[in-house]
Amino acid sequence: MKKLAFIYFLALSVFCTATAQKHYTVVISLDGYRWDYTEWYDTPFMDMMADKGVKSALIPSYPSKTFPNHYSIVTGLYPDHHGIVANSFLDRTTGESFSLGNPEQKINPVYYGGEPVWVTAQKQGLSTAVFYWPGSDVRIGGQYPNTYYMYDRKPRLTIEERLNGVIGQLSLPESQRPDLIMAYYEQPDSYGHEYGPFSKKTRSVIGHIDSLLTDFHAKLVKLPIADRVNLIVLADHGMSWVGAGNSVKIASRLRPEWIEKIDGNLPANIYCRDGFADSVVNALQGLDHARVWKKENVPARLNYGTNQRVGEVIVDPDLGYIIDERDLPGGGMHGFDPACLDMHALFRAMGPDFKHVEIPHFRNVDIYPLLCRLLGIKPADNDGCVEEIAEILK
C-alpha cells in the first residue's frame, strides 16, 4: 500500500512539474500588414495559424502610423499618453522637433513615456530579447532589453537573420533563454506605399513573408520546447490607396505669422504661435476632404489632443486624401482614422495558452496587458484591458 502511495505521489509530482513548465512568448510584427491581405492573397502560413489558434485584427491607435503604434502595442498606452504622438512632432517643453530621421533624437528617452513590456518583464525577473522593435534601442526607465539591436547601425539583420535569431534565442539553455522575444520587420509597408495595397508587387512580398514564416515555423516545431511557445504575429496598421492628385492644400489659406510649424500629413499637426489657433481654424473652415479641429475638440474616441506635443490645430483628411502642397502620384498611405477598416492590422496567435477562436477586431493597446498575462507579470498602468479579449485564452 505504501509502495502504491509512493508511486501515486511520484506520478503526481511529475505531472505537476510538467504542467508548471514555463511558457515562452514570441511576437513578430510585420509593418503595414493590412488585416485582409490574408483574404486577397495566398497566405498558407497565416491560414494555418487561424486554423490552429486565434484569428482577429488590431484596431490601431490614432494616428495610424508606425512608430506611435508599435510603441502603443508594447506599452498599452495611446500615443497621446505615451508621448510618441506622431512619426515627427514638436515638443513644446524642450522646443526640439522629434524626427525618425534624426538618430540622436530617436534614441533620447525623454520622448518615451510609459513602460514597454520588456522593461516590465525585466523588472520582475524575466529575460527579454528584441530585434529592432521601435523603441527597443532606447534606454527607457534606465533599461534596454537584455538583448537588443540598434536600428540605425548598419547593415541591419535581414528578415531571415532576425527569424533565425529568434530560433537561436529559443535554442539557448533554459537558464539563458529569454521569456519574451520580439522581432520587427519593415515589410510589407514599403511595398504598400510604393505600389498600393492591391498590386502584383504587394502580392509578391506577402507571399515571400508567408514563405519565410513557414520556414521559421518548421524550425520552431523541431525545438524541444516547441509546445511551450506562444507565437503572435501582428501588425501596426493597414494601408489604403490615395489616388494621384488627391492632395488637400492648406498653406495658401494660412499666414506665416500664425504658424510656428506644420508637421505630418496624416494628420497634419499645426503648431500655432500664441493666440493664433482660432485664426488658423477659421481660415481652414470649409476645407474639402478634411476635418479641422482645435486640439481640445478632437473627438474623444480618438484619444488624442491632450499631450503638449500635439499641434494646437489638427487637420485630418478623408480616407483616400493626404495633406500636401504637392500633386502627388498615387500610392498607399496610412495614418487615417482607426475606424476605417483599411487601417486595421493583422493579428494571429497560437500556442499552449491560446484557444482556437475567431474574435472581432480589437484595440492594439490590449496587447500589452495580454503579453503581461502570458508572461505572468503585473502590468504597469495602461489603457488596455485584457478582459476584453479573455476569450482567446485557455
Per-region residue spans from a language model:
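A long, amphipathic alpha-helix that forms part
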Residues: 157-171, 188-229, 278, 371
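Metal-dependent active-site segment of extracytoplasmic phospho-/sulfohydrolases and closely related
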Residues: 27, 45, 208-250
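Bacterial Sec-dependent N-terminal signal peptides
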Residues: 1-23
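Short, structured active-site-proximal loop/turn typified by the sulfatase FGly-forming signature C/S-X-P-X-R
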Residues: 38-82
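Loop/turn elements at helix/coil->beta-strand transitions in domains of secreted/extracellular proteins
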Residues: 21-26, 51-55, 123-129, 175-181, ...
